């Protein structure tokens, strides 16, 4: 539900101009979905969701041809469904989290609000996105431009060197309980299922 709600902004208010720019809808929406989860369930839950997204991204990176791991795709002469994989979602949201981590949430949120105000009700291309972020967030700061690695995130395959894997300890109790059950150290009824949710 959170994902589809977030499409009110990224997908409806500002939408991708072509299927090559699909990540602009899904990467932003996945990022917003995580922010909604953080607001409702707290930081630890949001990071747990980020870890699951990151792990899925790692799996996808291993299975796709390198060109299909770029955010901005080249689907010329191809079925647009060829670009419908988790790269747009998970790499796109990881890219936005990287920008947030580098510039800080307050500054990033101010840029996000402005981005949607400036571009409301118009189709967006990746080039237009990059122009906007350079004009309204980077603002000519060469050191920040280098640190963000915008072009590497968008146009290069795989992940740039500034990608940071999220880390969560929240999975340990679940893994410990599952392992204890597996090795026969307790009945399934002893596992605290009531505290878990999906």
Predicted regions and their residues:
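Non-catalytic terminal regions of proteins
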Residues: 176-198
